[in-house]
Amino acid sequence: MKKIMRGVLLFGMLGGMLLSCGNNKSNDSQEPKKDSKVNEKVYKIGLSQIVDHPALNAAKQGFKDALEKAGVKADYDDKIANNDMSNQTLIMKQFAADKKDLVFAITTPTAQAAKNQIGKETPVIFGSVTDPKSAGLVGIPNVTGTSGAAPITENLKLMRELLPEAKKIGIIYNSSEQNSVSEVNNLKKLAGEHGFTVVEKAVTNGTEMVAAANLISKDIDIYYAIQDNTVASYFAAILDVFNNAKVPVLATNDVYSNAGGLISQGTTDYNIGYRSGEIAAEILLKGKKPNEIPIETVKNLQIEINKQNMQLLGIKIPDSILKQAKMVETKKN
């Protein structure tokens, strides 16, 4: 009888241990499921830009990379307006109807459309905007972002160092782009301090670009490529004009030097987009309001020199510039 009782007790103890182990395994397997629910929300984010262009695509990639690094899970709705403001307005109206959690607007016209169409309850983050104040983007409760304001003073100094005898700077811009108008006005204000005069040509669409380039190429010493969406879209065509006229191109963005322009100095669009993404993460994950985050001007200037164009034009770059520059070669699209 004692042997039987011992057997029953032993069986009971073993059974209890097995049940205990089984419960632990069950709890362990359920634990990750509890953790996985933390931050598992997928945010609906609308992305838009006025045109499809490498510089703007770089800003978009920087934005996504910053959100990914911050741990934001996102369902992106990526729309391009094809340089048509009526399309841009419709895109923003659709984002509003879809009740996006956040909208990222790349370039000034896109940001202006977002400001006008997106409800005040939805955060709007912009990037690659030259002059947020002139664009009417300052003081809007649900709007903030990053400015890629061109370093005009620094670029005028670079022009003078590169071409000591130069007198006339040529510039082409789309008069309907507020960011471009602002940049041209600032250039004209500052050029005289560095011994330059500005030869400007305004266009209303891309079909006028080559004719404008042919016209001013006869009367300038250097062409200044600014952050204008029309210039960016037709840069390859006008670069041919300036190369044939032996007019060097200095640009505000590395996308121009990568595309064959002689030299660029500015902040990369990728860095601008990345900082915009960091701001978006603060809003989505930490609950910050856009009006609690000041608009930032991203300034991390880089000089790039296109080796092929330098050889084509036969220009000798001073050592003072070379030692702080990165040499690049033309990237084929």
List each language-model region with its residue ranges.
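Extracytoplasmic "Venus flytrap"
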Residues: 40-64, 70, 77-86, 176, ...
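Beta-alpha junction/loop-to-helix N-cap segments that form part of ligand/metal-binding clefts
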Residues: 80-136, 228-243, 247-250
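An alpha-beta-alpha
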Residues: 45, 49, 63, 148-194, ...
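Short beta-strand elements at the ligand-binding edges of bilobed clamshell
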Residues: 135-160, 259-274
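Structural motif
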Residues: 75-97, 202-216
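Pocket-lining segment of extracytoplasmic ligand-binding domains
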Residues: 178-254
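Hinge/cleft segment of the Venus flytrap/periplasmic-binding protein
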Residues: 282-333
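Bacterial lipoprotein signal-peptidase II cleavage site
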Residues: 19-31
